[in-house]
Structure formats: structure tokens, C-alpha cells
Amino acid sequence: MIKKCLFPAAGYGTRFLPATKAMPKEMLPVVNKPLIQYAVEEALEAGLSEIGIVTGRGKRSLEDHFDISYELEHQIRNTDKEKYLVGIRRLIDECTFAYTRQVEMKGLGHAILTGRPLIGDEPFAVVLADDLCLNLEGDSVLKQMVKLYNQFRCSIVAIQEVPPEETNKYGVIAGEMIRDDIFRVNTMVEKPKPEEAPSNLAIIGRYILTPDIFDLIEQTEPGKGGEIQITDALMKQAQDGCVLAYKFKGKRFDCGSAEGYIEATNFCYENLYKTGKAH
């Protein structure tokens, strides 16, 4: 049974400077909630209540967000503004939060390895908060993946089709189709040129990982820019036939780009905020 979810959140968010100069990109608001809150809500919906966050310098506001603000709550007590804190109070009450720092930015694989003390020796999820995933017609993306893990008991990556010219932005997989939405991975390439990509099936920021991934990351040699990529460690797992790729149901917004961030804001405003589902 998966109980833990890891959130790598130590990056600089340079694509959103100067907004992220003094604020983590994970705290950027989509209408009335920061990205990280949407992500933790998704984890809790999937039954994952033990939250680990890998932070860096200048990320204290992440910890403050998932803590009680006594002064604020006293100020708005017995007013109609109390309803705005119902969602975050639920997360504070129902989740446990633990934090560790990634001292150097050495890629996603290194960030996940940094979170090892928070996870221990058990399967866990990884969520990249700037990939906002929403499914208004059923289970959240992470809940879909947890159900799949309970069936197959192996590492799983979420994928979606992308335009061929955009494969150089993603890890890209190819593999044997098990059913329409599931592939057994046999090839995984990090940010290939379009002409070298094995497919247009791109990995997005949702993973279920088995604990042996930590040792595999430790054995992975740094690549371009000295970064350790999670795709390299996952490829080692795939060679043993134990990595699945899942075409999830729902919408994904790349909130690491201005275009995706605006698209997400418009979608959430129309479908969540205006309908009273955004708290």
C-alpha cells in the first residue's frame, strides 16, 4: 500500500523571473490556490497522506503554507472569509509534512534521491507541482496510477502524446502496448531531438516508484550539466521489465511555461472557481 508522496520543489523557477526571485514557483497561484496545494490535494485524494517535500534555499513559504496561521485565523474567525481556509486546513489536519533540503540542483534524479530519508524502503509517488493535472470527470491522475500500481506492483510513469517537434522538452518512452492506455517500457530517452525520438509519448510529472529506484539513482552517472536524470535509473528498471507507462485520463497543464500557466488559470477559473469548487 502506497502512503507517501514526494514533491521535488528545490528548483529556481527561472522561467518565471522576476516573480520567482523571492517566491518558490510552487507557490505561484492558479486563481486562489498555489500550485503545490493542488498537488497535495491530488495526493490526498489518492490516499497518500504522508507528504515529503524536497526544498531549497528561499523556500520557507512552502512550509509556512502547510502550517496553521493563528493570527490570520483569529482575524477572520466568525466571518464569511473562514470558508477560504477550509481546503488548506483539511490538508494540515489529514496529512503529515516532512521536509529536507537539496543543497545542489543536480537534476530530478538527485532531488528524488535527496528525499530518500523521508521515504524509507517502500513504494512512493513523485509529483512535480508545476505539472497541474486535473480530471473533473473521475479519479485524479495520481489515484488512477495508484490503482494501477495495486494491480501490477511496479514503477509507473504518466505519459501523454505531444507534438513530435516538442519531444526535446521531455523524457520520451517506447514500448509494448499491454492495453490501449498502458505500455511496458523498453526504451526511455531524456529530451531527444525530434528526429531521434522513439515515439511522441512524453513523460509528465507523475510517477509511482518502487524503493529500489534509490540504489539505481546512486549508480547513475551524471549527464549533461552534471545532472542525474530519473529516466536513466528508470531505464535500468525497464531492462528488467518492471516499468509501465500510463496514458492518464484528464488534463495536464505545463505551469512551468507562461502559456500553460495562463491556460491553467483560465481553466480553473471557469471550471472550479466560478462553480464554487476551488476552496
From Swiss-Prot:
What GO MF annotations does this protein's record show?
UTP:glucose-1-phosphate uridylyltransferase activity
What is the main EC category here?
A: transferase
Give the catalytic activity: alpha-D-glucose 1-phosphate + UTP + H(+) = UDP-alpha-D-glucose + diphosphate
Known EC number: 2.7.7.9
User: What keyword terms does UniProt attach to this protein?
Assistant: Nucleotidyltransferase, Transferase
Record bears the keyword Nucleotidyltransferase = yes
* Family label: Belongs to the UDPGP type 2 family.
User: What protein is this chain from?
Assistant: UTP--glucose-1-phosphate uridylyltransferase
Give the organism the record lists: Pseudomonas aeruginosa (strain ATCC 15692 / DSM 22644 / CIP 104116 / JCM 14847 / LMG 12228 / 1C / PRS 101 / PAO1)
Lineage of producing organism: Bacteria, Pseudomonadati, Pseudomonadota, Gammaproteobacteria, Pseudomonadales
